[in-house]
Amino acid sequence: MAILAQTNGLSNPVCCLLTVGRARCFRGSDQKRAICQVIHSPLSSPRFWQSERKVYRTTTHVPWELGQIMDSETFEKSRLYQLDKSTFSFWSGLYSELEGTMILLCGGIPFLWNVSGQISGRAGFEPEYEIAQSLVFLLLATLFSAVTGLPWSLYNTFVIEEKHGFNQQTLGFFFKDAIKKFIVTQCILLPVTSLLLYIIKIGGDYFFIYAWLFTLVVSLVLVTIYADYIAPLFDKFIPLPEGELKQAIEMMAKSIDFPLTKVYVVEGSKRSSHSNAYFYGFFKNKRIVLFDTLLEDYCALNKEHSEGEDGEDDDTKSKVKNKKQGCKNEEVLAVLGHELGHWKLGHTIKNIVISQMNSFLCFFLFAVLIGQKELFAAFGFYETQPTLIGLMIIFQFIFSPYNENTNGIDVHHLQ
């Protein structure tokens, strides 16, 4: 099996239930004040950021390990780009923390829940229809997150990426793409969430097992259909033409017994000049996808796009067409060899197993903690204990330190 390496912004159904920030939470009860401090891992601490930034600032010469493969100009461009990205990461992260803190301190979560109840009530759903209210809450919360994150996304795309020559989007294309992503995400997220909440409601004492199995099935289905049905909504995929590169890729795959069936090229150049490669598929039906920006002199997709065959207007077209770009065949094979190495060494299977073990543990602990009314009261829910809010509190806040550490382990494992 192979898990999809890139999801175009679509997250795991459980993880994207709600993202409102991580911060301190305060509550008052019997004249006592309880404080729940969400602990962050060292990876998100200012000390780590300062250490990383110091490396970017002081390493002004090409390290000897890279001297044979990278010139000074390329290294300097990369260093300055990472400096700007580091600064952006700090300020956007700080804003996220402040936003999350204000939401918690001002009672934003119970307020939005009450507003969601009013909206669902006007739609004809009584208070006992908790799932309907939960879906309204989720829609409003993700809309709020998208709107508040928009200025940061715009700055990242049209200031930082533009400054360093990576951005290929127009403003019109950016907004159309963002709206499309939001709609597609809601079409997946809302039905999946409603079914998950229903399973938890009727699952009895062993609901955590059924919920875990459900999310496992959903994850596998999304991995299966993403590249064939979801990704084409955003990007154009065409088979890699016959030639030396395709033959070399097929030979590489054969040499490690990789069951390759097709090789595609995706039009990544309409968004960015960054390049990438990944593979997907289950069992004996695996496919490789190369970004067109990875391939030297490859411009078939850009040419078709400029001729208007995809029906998009001028505002949505990328700004640079038929530009010489990418890597030589040997370099493409090196990039692809890294990805195939994950498969050959069993990283994909190991990652899936570890991920599902982690998911099961989280649902089990959720089953243990969901009955604690004090958790709900700490977030302003004194009379009701909605299942969606419980999922958000436990997965987003209580498990925050655990999630940070396991994410770090996953990254280290894949590297």
Regions found by a protein language model. Name each.
Residues 2-18, 31-387, 397, 401-415:
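Polar-ligand-bearing catalytic/cofactor-coordination segments
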